[in-house]
């Protein structure tokens, strides 16, 4: 009886700690089941149980124990249990072999659908929403900001979550606070966590967002309010990984868990639904993929998506082609990043040949909410080559480039990236031509960087933001720049510029004239009208 009670307690304790799904297609559950069958076999199936010590005696001042195998045997129950363990593991191995890429290459290739387009269809980039900062920089900014708040840093630390989201069309990283240690948890868990950190990935500004209702369910809880444990109790058979921390359009905190189903056998998990947990009260709701709320950004995790995109590029012409001739075999480049397009976040990575040479064949964008994957064909330099080119432009400073982001400026593919010093802080920014990667522009701000590129190539950005201006012309001058007549004048001491082609009134402009217009980048007027 004692052994039965011991095993039941042991099963409950290990399940409470490790939380495997009660699902036969989960390797976690298979090992959990086999492990406990082995414990039961030891407790009830061996003739001598676990008492194999014959005698203990002292020799030359040392205690020695001898194993007693006399009379040891495995009874009928033990044999059944050991055979069951062997059978389960053998069946799992056989299923894995039969459903491996050797026999299922076409199925692996078709796990995801990749739509192919030309780069001319690559989304135009809103230059005010390019996430220049990388994750590590955002973490430093968030952690330092929290460190400046003495009333908070004594009780809490920033979680290492820093999920990148698109909020109101702009890229941010968000992370909840967590209890600094078990004592701080004990003192504060009743009232919960009242804030989370939000870092603007464009400007680098950080803020501590106050919550009307504090977070009660988080990854820093120790018992039943731990996020994964709470979800496992409610959904014991569902397969999910670490839920992502997200906020809705009103800034309310949630955890989003993608539910997986193996596509064949024990291989290739694919999302089938989403569970959303309200971090303030523990309420949960499961959504089908078609009904996921629009504020949710991360349904299809980056790592699984990239792995399955590689399946598509590797096995589309069969297993042996992938292993031997490697004709038309492609793979993603080493690294990825995120882009905010509209209200969604997109995974970005490059595509190169299986030989991993110094050129890309194109680029991948995946909508992380809908799972739609598009490949844009374009022969260009790899992201690593672009990084090396940018670092070479400032080699005297020993800056290291962040992983580049591909942007489309007036149908021109460009890599944009930050340049970090030894402390990991972004000091400058670089723009590298994706095709002719020796062409590099470096500046201390993104605005200056884009302005340099626009002036060098005589461009105006389609999505450039403008401001209205009305005033009186003073100190009027003109000059010819790159073949264009440009008028310079001051309004309230500030210099403005306008090209002669903007308005027919400009050749007749005089000091003292009142005008109105729209000011764009670098103080150039996009519209101009004399009143």
Spans of features found by a protein language model:
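Soluble extracytoplasmic regions of secretory-pathway and membrane proteins
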Residues: 6-531
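Positively charged n-region of N-terminal signal peptides that target proteins for export
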Residues: 1-3
């Amino acid at each position: 009886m004692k052994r039965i009670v011991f095993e039941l307690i042991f099963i409950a304790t290990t399940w409470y700690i490790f939380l495997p799904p009660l699902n036969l297609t989960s390797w976690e559950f298979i090992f959990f089941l086999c492990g406990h069958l082995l414990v039961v076999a030891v407790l009830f199936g061996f003739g001598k149980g676990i008492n194999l010590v014959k005698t203990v005696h002292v020799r030359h001042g040392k205690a020695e124990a001898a194993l007693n195998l006399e009379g040891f045997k495995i009874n009928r129950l033990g044999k059944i249990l050991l055979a069951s363990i062997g059978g389960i593991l053998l069946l799992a191995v056989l299923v894995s072999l039969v459903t491996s890429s050797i026999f299922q290459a076409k199925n692996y290739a078709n796990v995801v659908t990749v739509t192919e387009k030309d780069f001319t269809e690559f989304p135009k980039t809103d230059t005010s929403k390019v996430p220049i900062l990388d994750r590590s920089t955002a973490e430093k900014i968030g952690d330092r900001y929290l460190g400046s708040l003495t009333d908070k840093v004594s009780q809490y630390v920033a979680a290492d979550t820093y999920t990148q989201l698109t909020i109101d069309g702009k890229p941010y990283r968000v992370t909840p606070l967590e209890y600094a240690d078990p004592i701080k948890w004990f003192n504060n868990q009743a009232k919960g966590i009242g804030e989370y950190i939000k870092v603007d990935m464009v400007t680098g500004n950080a803020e501590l967002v106050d919550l009307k209702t504090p977070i009660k369910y988080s990854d820093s809880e120790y018992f039943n309010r731990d996020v994964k444990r709470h979800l496992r109790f409610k959904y014991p058979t569902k397969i999910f990984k670490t839920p992502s921390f997200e906020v809705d359009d009103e800034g309310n905190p949630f955890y989003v868990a993608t539910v997986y189903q193996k596509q064949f056998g024990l291989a290739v998990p694919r999302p089938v639904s989403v569970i959303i947990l309200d971090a303030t009260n523990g309420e949960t709701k499961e959504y089908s993929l078609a009904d996921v709320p629009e504020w949710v950004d991360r349904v299809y995790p980056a790592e699984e998506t990239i792995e399955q995109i590689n399946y598509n590029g590797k096995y589309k012409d069969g297993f042996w082609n992938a292993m031997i001739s490697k004709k038309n075999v492609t793979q993603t480049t080493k690294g990825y990043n995120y882009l905010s397009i509209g209200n969604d976040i997109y995974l970005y990575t490059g595509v190169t040949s299986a030989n991993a040479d110094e050129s890309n064949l194109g680029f991948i964008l995946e909508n992380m909410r809908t799972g739609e994957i598009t490949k844009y064909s374009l022969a260009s330099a790899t992201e690593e080559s672009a990084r090396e080119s940018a670092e070479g432009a400032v080699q005297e400073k020993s800056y290291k480039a962040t992983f580049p982001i591909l942007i489309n400026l007036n149908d021109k593919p460009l890599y944009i990236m930050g340049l970090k010093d030894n402390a990991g802080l972004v000091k400058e920014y670089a723009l590298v031509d994706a095709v002719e990667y020796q062409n590099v522009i470096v500046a201390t701000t993104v605005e200056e960087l884009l302005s340099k590129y626009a002036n060098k190539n005589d461009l105006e950005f389609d999505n450039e933001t403008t401001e209205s201006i009305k005033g009186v012309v003073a100190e009027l001058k003109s000059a010819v720049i790159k073949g264009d007549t440009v008028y310079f004048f001051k309004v309230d001491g500030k210099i403005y510029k306008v090209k002669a082609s903007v308005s027919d009134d400009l050749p007749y402009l005089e000091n003292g004239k009142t005008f109105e217009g729209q000011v764009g980048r670098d103080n150039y007027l996009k519209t101009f009208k004399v009143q």
